[in-house]
Amino acid sequence: MTGPTRADAVRAMLEARTIAVVGASPRPGSFGARLLTELERSPSRPTVHLVNPRYDRIGARVCLPSLGEIPDPVDLVALAVGDHALEEQLVLAAGRGDRSSVIYGSAFENGVGRGGLRARLTSVANGAGMALCGAGCMGFVSVAHGLRAIGYVEPDPLPAGPVALVTHSGSAFSALLRADRRLGWSLAVSSGQELVTTTADYIDYALGLDGTRVVALLLETLRRPAALLAALHRAAAADVPVVALTVGGTPGGRAMVAAHSGALAGDDATWEALCESTGMIRVADLAEMTDTLELIGAGRRAPAPPAPGISPVHDSGAERALGPVGRGIASVHDSGAERNAIGPVGRGIASVHDSGAERALVVDVAHSLDLPFADIGPETTARLAALLDDGLDATNPLDVWGTGASARTVLAGSLTALAADPSVGAVALAVDLVHELDGDRSYIEAAIDAWDATTKPVCVLANLPSALDRTAARELRDHGLPVLEGTRSGLLALRHLLSLGAPPTPPAEVVAPEMPGRRARWVTRLAAGPLRADEALALLADYGIPGPAAHSAGSRAEALTAADAVGYPVVLKTDRPDISHKSDVGGVVVGLDGPEALAAAYDELAGRLGPDMVVMATAPPGVEMALGVVRDPLLGPLVVVGAGGVLVELLADRRVGMPPLTATAARRMVQRLAVRPVLDGIRGGIVADVGALAAAVVGLSHLAVELGDVIVALDVNPLRCGPGGVLALDALIELGPSQSRPG
């Protein structure tokens, strides 16, 4: 089922006007009864047909013995029946021409395994062009169209708003809908196993709803990866951020996902590549997700960075300290200890605090997250100084707590002054917002004053959610002002907000240079068997990744001839195809400055490791990096760049992208490496050509596109990076049966 037919079926399901409930029940607490209750709560008032051969009537309503008794096809068949009855009922619905179905049950088949029944249900629905939510789901609430097709009692009414939710987890679905966050929903789907209709379909539908400003995903696996990738790019092009919580990135997590849903979980490289390619925001837990959704859902964005940093207003001095790392925030503190500053790089945050210790806490956490505070200008400093009591420093993050007099004026004025600074991308009132026993409303009113005085993002950042005054938080949220619940989760949300920018270029739109015959030439050679070391370097050179002069040798005489060709000093390496890590077996000898040294080294290596060698010119010194191509079972070939050398596995410092890559995307991957400062020659080290490294990443991405169907994995380690460019010193290529990229 593809194209308009698929989209039409999804729309018929999520906007259903006629619904059949198979398994309707009058028994209180039963699934069939709860489903009826929820459908009756639907503001759209759909026509609902009850089906259950056990009953003639349920309450005042007629109950039919069979789905076949309904005269006309319906938009949605809700199957509130046991797994044993699912196939029969879905076949009946498909034969009648019903448009869609929800399968709430898990669709397990005793004695047959998990795949059999689910595969047959999938085939039935696809053959009939039906949309299908589930199996193993809680259903959906189409808030924008007033439809509640869920079998569990959820908040009524569910507040309308900017968030479209799709989750593989039913428990997370219920928890998010019940969270007292005033998030507001346009659509909420518990999609379960996604036998037919998948996350990509729901995203595409949600993008067509006027109210959707952000999409929230909880994903156990990638289903229909190509369709999901396209949907995520459409979301980015529409300026609708996608926030995803992914699970199953560890071996234990993958096993649990498989046990839970039978799904192959994407590992961390899969998710990282997806985020790198589409701009999808990845969060680590539900706390980070809800803070991020609330902040982005408020609808305000940090302006384009004319200068670095954002500034926070703190009510304590200790929460304020930070230096530069990229775009940042601003905070106001009410105590001096919370304030230690870090310098600006791009937009930053600003924060205002009323406690010194909590300001320091915020600063420490922000620093650990690479979230910078804005470097505010002299005009802002002067405005702040005029508001503060004597002895308080006018800096960002800001501790405003002196005598406590005129708290509303000082807090609101500080927040507003920081928001007006060009270097500030977002402002946080970083206070605990506890219940004020004396009825004081200074914090509430100051936050609202600041929100109304600027168009920049303003939020309240509470450090201890359990102490948060829920009534005060509700008032602020009703005014549109986000209240972030937790130091780390709130600061991460601010970092995500500041990361929003121009959408990445979809891989399909990246134009690779045309090299007629290149792919055919290498496919033919690779089909003949493994490459020699010099051939592997030639392959890389064909894709713009140079290497030193190199020649293969199968005897001492050939080695000496090769050395004469490349010039002394030379490097001698074993070229046995079964040895992956040459240095581990003593298979590399460097600094051979003449024929005698080379002959002796050759004889020694040949005696231990066999006669096949490669003789290479000695490369100039540089920083050792690594490049790679891996074939992901879900996304196809992926490109990896990271720290190289003998510590590559230990350091595990790498970034992953989906080919083909633009130069901008490749530079971004390099910039995000922890080892990136080393390339600038720290402590007198060698300064590497970062542009050449990024160009090598781009070249490898073109190789991955052209040859990713025959190469299972490719490692370039080390890739020597110096001031004159890069040189690939070794390459390991694993071949496999030809495969096209998964769709």
Residue ranges and their predicted role:
Residues 1-316, 321, 328-330, 336-743:
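Catalytic-core regions of core metabolic enzymes
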